[in-house]
């Protein structure tokens, strides 16, 4: 009987310890309460389809992972991997020694990169890496998570800092906490100064200029919306919502310079995120679980095409265990779409669906 009591006491002690852990163990976030907008996943304009079923995958057996973004220049393809390697058709072009995310070539054929670890950097034709900016000169706040960029005809580089609080790899903390730590910034190569244009963004992600460069878009991943910041005209210096209540988490965005913005959705909206938006204490409890037991993304390719007024003109999807997912960037070159992924080993390509 005494032995049974000892076992019972140990079980009770372990049970109490588990309860204390899940209810009181410190976590590195202070979640806020918010009201998630109406779930639009079942709306007709976002209806499930198989238009991305036939994505062809390239360079998936070269030993690298996470070609987040893709650029084409002089008939060559450039991709950046999670190892820091920048690869082209000719082999390894350079290595940022960080985590290259958004990329674009400037007018002098320097490859400008939003590097999540190193900041805003430039790589010349010989593969030499140069740091352009690591903080905003207007508020003196250093970058934590430089994410995406676009370059204007005058050379100015518009880019995002996803979070001024959490660095690369802490995306989940940003999602669970839900505080506006993101920024939209601009770097002027003429003055070598960086200015903050927009503060208080909920995970500032993709950045893209309009065809006439009168405005620039920045995705707010954790709010399912895209902000428009006016650069010209009477509204210059102000911002407004371009589109909101998206059916998933917007990642990168690009313009085909013919009036279409292509938006990569990392994943459809998540039931737990929806349900727990106004339950910050519950999000703390779930964060204490092993990551494998926390909400996970599904295999779902998802891309939207928007005109410059924010109207949906393309809804491209494919949900399957064989889907190329997650798609984190999409760019159009001639009549093809090129896809990047934060975690997939290869990049994808498909003809622009009609």
Model-derived features: positions:
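Sequence-structural signature of mature extracellular/luminal beta-sheet repeat domains
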Residues: 2-354
